[in-house]
Amino acid sequence: MTAEDILLRERTSTTTQRPVNSEQYLNVQLATAPVKNFQTTSEISRQTLVDTSNDDVYSIKNLKGSRNPISPSVSNVGFQSIFHTVDHPRSKVSVASNHSLRSNDNASAATSKSGSSQIGESHSVDTVECSNNLSKKLSSDAISITQKSLHSTPSGRYMKGKASGFFNRRNRAHTTISSDPASFLTDSSTLHNSSHSFRNVIKNFFQNKSHRHIGQDAIEPAIPNSLSKFLHSSYGRHKSPSQFIHTNAGQLVDSGTSVYSLNVNPSGVNPNTIVEDPLSGTDPASPNPVSMLHDLLRNLPSLEANYKHFNSQELTTLTNNIWNIFCSNVAELFRTQRIWKLRAKIENFNEVLEFYCILKTDPRVTHSGMNRIISDLKEFLVSSLYNLENQIVFNYSNEDTINNALKRLGVIWRIFYQEVYYDLAAVLLPLDQSIREDGNSTVLKSGNESRTHINGNYSIGFLLLMCFRDSIVLPCYENFVNSNDGISKSFQLYIFNQEEESNVTETDKLTLLQCFGILSTIQSNDRNQRIIEELLAGIRMSI
């Protein structure tokens, strides 16, 4: 072995056993192969500050395409390079994105050089930043997906502004502020665009709120006038059966529409069948008198305030309808119903009657004034008394009493004077003052008798007694007029005969004495009044 071989072996062993300097190793590695770290702090800043409201697709691609200078760039591969020609220049957004990528890559390289002196600290920082970058990248992807879904909904603009505002505040709390001055401009423009978008949403939401009723008045459905039905003639055709009962040969006729309808069926007709007036054309489906009265009471203030604007025909129709409604409800008093069982208060009936008197005395309706009111009331009372008589006859349990004329008159008088008379006087009370003020009224008499001029006290009470006298008493005892012995003597003999045959008692005679005595106070100075005075004399002679 030569001296040269020995020297060569020593050099080789020295080179192999020489300790490795970490600084030299790091420098060599940095020069030949850069350390693969995850220092993407600037990249995170770009994700936060990129304006995604204008071009979401390009912004997402640019964020995903950021790499180290040595790694391949997305802009240099794939379909994007196809459009990078003279005929198809790149968009301004793409150019601005690549420019920001280059500046941020240089800053990243400088940061990696300054941090390579401390490998332990660099390794720990890289680990923390890796986890932060991963979470922030997921958050950025979630924002992009949310923005895309919001664009597909009708209210996407409004919800996009709210969602982007929330995520931007959250990202600013967990992201370091970039040192790039352009990032502040980008962030301020994003806030301005979000605010502008929110204002547009508010305008779209509320631009028609203050004018939503303008232009819609013409298409609104017409509301029917509640007063028009009272001005229609068909509404007044629902007449009370008491107004035409005297034309039915004494049979009891009931409309069946009243709340106090009778259950009597003397003619064998189906009780569910409504008996109609052939002259009135009453609709079987018409409302009952109670509902019509309540409807009238609800509209009475409006009618009183507006009746002066009606023409003559409307006033006449309104007057007839009000009177028919009033009579249909008051007729229940002649069906052995007391006043407290009626479906309206006494004050309500008085108000309706007062308004009827106002309409009836209007020159556009009639020129007869109070005389026409008394004539209408008399017609109603006479027909209602026929109803009362028929009802008592068909409902009285003792046939012997009903078949005797004296006893039957006593029963009808007691019911009329003890119940109907005072209840009816309370309902017709407003007419008392009107009649007393017009004391020289001319009452239309029935039959062929002339008009009789009545002086002195004339009230509703006298009118009620007069109607009872003419409709109930005189038809039964008028045959005594043709007697040769005189009315009073013939009537006395008749009473003595009935005491033996029909067992007429002193109570029955006293009842007739009361009846004829009260009827004689009418002082009408006519033929009917003279007959009552003769009958009163005959009953006195029989006691």
Curated annotation (Swiss-Prot):
The free-text function statement in the UniProt record for this protein reads: Component of TORC2, which regulates cell cycle-dependent polarization of the actin-cytoskeleton and cell wall integrity. TORC2 controls polarity of the actin cytoskeleton, which is required for orienting the secretory pathway toward discrete growth sites, via the RHO1/PKC1/MAPK cell integrity pathway.
Its membrane topology, per UniProt?
Peripheral membrane protein
What is the protein named? Target of rapamycin complex 2 subunit BIT61
Cell membrane is among the record's keywords: yes
InterPro entries annotated for this entry? Bit61/PRR5
As for family, the record states: Belongs to the BIT61 family.
The answer to whether UniProt assigns keyword Flavoprotein to this entry is no
Q: What is the species listed in this Swiss-Prot or TrEMBL entry?
A: Saccharomyces cerevisiae (strain ATCC 204508 / S288c) (Baker's yeast)
